Every structure is written in structure tokens, then in C-alpha cells.
Amino acid sequence: MLYAILGTSRMEEAMVKAIVGANCGDEGKGKITDMLAEESDIVVRFQGGSNAGHTIINDYGKFALHLLPSGVFYNHITSVIGNGVALNIPYLVKELKSLTDRNVPMPKILVSDRAQIMMPYHIDFDTYEEARLAGKSFGSTKSGIAPFYSDKYAKIGFQVSELFGDENTLKEKIANVCTLKNVMLEHLYHQPLLNEEDIFNTLMEYKEMVKPYVCDTSAYLHQALKEGKKILLEGQLGSLKDPDHGIYPMVTSSSTLAPYGAIGAGIPAASITDVVTVVKAYSSAVGAGAFVSEIFGDEADELRRRGGDGGEFGATTGRPRRVGWFDCVATRYGVECQGATQVVMTALDCLSYLEEIPVCVGYEIDGKVIKDFPVTHILKDCKPVLKTLKGWHCDIRGIQNFEDLPQEAKDYVAF
């Protein structure tokens, strides 16, 4: 995948960098994260869960990481799962095993004692709710993310630290959770009820699984900052999936913005000195929601087939991604939301087959053209205003320097 770094910044000197997406995710962050991880001492996942994947291609093969930080392929890196992550403990263990089964050395992993635990019933509730909503569903990956974060903010989630506390206190909390959940299961979803003993036993199993990795990761990271370590904060999805600033309600349930990296990792906000924001040379999305520059039919199938690392299909769901032309309005907004100090464009080579390349430069709504990204109820009625750029129509894979690109490709990046 070809990429270009745009703009200037303090990339080499930065102590803490955040790498995030400007759009709906799938921007190619994994490739850039892998590149930056090699220069880092610590890589931190700070939000989300196993609901989205980062594709990494290296000497060990091709991997789609869903929960583990991208630093797991480097022996010198400590990989941290921060307090902001939706921690699916069996999935963590499974993903670690999938690495070692393919001859990747066992990575150094730390898990925050303040992280909250994804429970099996979160995944069940996600599935039940999508079924209940039917044609009006949000296109969930059914990874339990929305029910998990609902419980976290309703203060009925289970923190990792609680596994190592008083068991009677834990059992009292389980009883309260079951009382609340079983009302919904019985009267709304008409599904089997939760059993207190089963939940306690599950949590005790999780305790043994995660015990080797648990620590106060915030204290660890604060000490690392004092020692001048290089820390990389690895974001999931992108600006347009943020619950506050994205295409609500077709969003995820945790903040996808770089400033949240400090909260989800447990470090001072001022310590983030670089925000590397990734965009793709065209647009893509998984699931429902407004998508102004979307294309359809044979045109979409061709771009989908040529896109990404082996086609535009979700790393978690395998669903074909919706695709469209580069959207200047949405991308500018996404970059601004992230507070980008650098912008990286990926997948430029995927457009090499086109003689002409449309770009969305504005939105038309009620006979007017707007350049600012609107709220959802306006966005869904917008039509793309397209400008056609000349394609380079040659293979640019393998080109290492921006100056060596065909002029048309350079013009596209600079547009």
C-alpha cells in the first residue's frame, strides 16, 4: 500500500504520538502504526474493543489485530491495553495464541487494572438489539460494544481490579446486574435469563486468564514519560464514528478522537505532542449511515476489488465495504476534529487503474453548495459536488519518494 505524509511537524522528537483515522475507519492505520511502532518503546490501545481490525503485513505474514496493540510484533516494545478499552479476555488470549501459533515471539503485554471487562451477555444483548431493530439497526459488528459502554457509564460494568478484590462484594454486584438485565431479557428480548453463579464462575475464569498481565498501567506510563520513553497511542476507527462528532447515531460507543487517547491510556493530555491522522485516497465504510460520495454497481465493485490489502472487506465482519470517491468535506472535518499535526494518505496506488478520478469537493442541499460537514439529518439529504482530476494510469507500487510519483499522482495528493 502506497502512502504519503503531508505537512510538517515534530515527528522525530515527539515523546507521545497518537495515530488516528479521519473518516469511518479502514483508512490504513495499521500500516502506518506498524511503521511508527518500530520506532516506539510502548504502544497503547486506548479505546474500543475487538469490533474493528487493523491489518498488518510483515515478515510473519498477514494479520488482522482486533484487540492487541500493533507493537506485538517487536521484541523491544511493551504493548499496553489501557483503561479505555472494552476488554474481551477470552479474545485477548485467543489473539495471543494466534500469534505464537504462527511463530511470532510472545509479546510483552500489560493490561490496565482499570480496564472494564466485556462479558458474554454484552455480545448477546448486542445481537438481541440488532434483531429487535431489524431494518432500522445500526449495522453493529455484534461485538458487544454498545452494551459494554452502556454498562460502563451506568456504573454496572466489571473492572479488572474487581476480580482481585473481595468475592462477596463482587457477588453482590453480580446479583444487582442480574436483576437489571433479567428484566430486559424477560420482557423486551424474551431470551434466557442470566444466572448469578454462572457469571461469577466466568469472572473467576477470566481472573486466571488475565492475571499475568494486569498492573497499574497508568503508573507505568507516567514513569515511562519521566524516563523519556517513546509512546504511541493507537486509535481505532475514525472521526466520523465518534459518538459526539461523528454521523450519530451510526457511530461507535467510545471516543475515536486523539484527545481521548490521554483519558483511555491514563496519561496527561498535554503529553500528546503529535497527532498523526490517516486518510485514504478514496472513501469506504462498513455498515449503515449517510455516505455522500458513495458509488454503486460495477464502478463500486471494481474499486472494492482493487482496494486495500486484498480488497475492501471488513477485517472483523468480512462484509464488503461500501466505497466512494475521496470526500474533501468529510475528510477536512475529520482531520480538524483530530487536531492533526500530520496527515498521512494511504492506498494511492489503488486508484492507478483510473484515467479520470472524481473527487467530492462540496455537498449540494436544497439547491445550495456547502463546504462544512453538517449534522446527520442534513447529511443524509446531501448530494456530492464532484470535480474530476486526471489519473496517472500507471503502476506506482514500489515508489518510495513523493518526488518520484507521476505529476498527476502528486497533483491528486496536493489537491
Protein language model annotation of sequence segments:
Residues 2-415:
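Non-transmembrane, aqueous-exposed alpha-helical and coiled segments at domain scale
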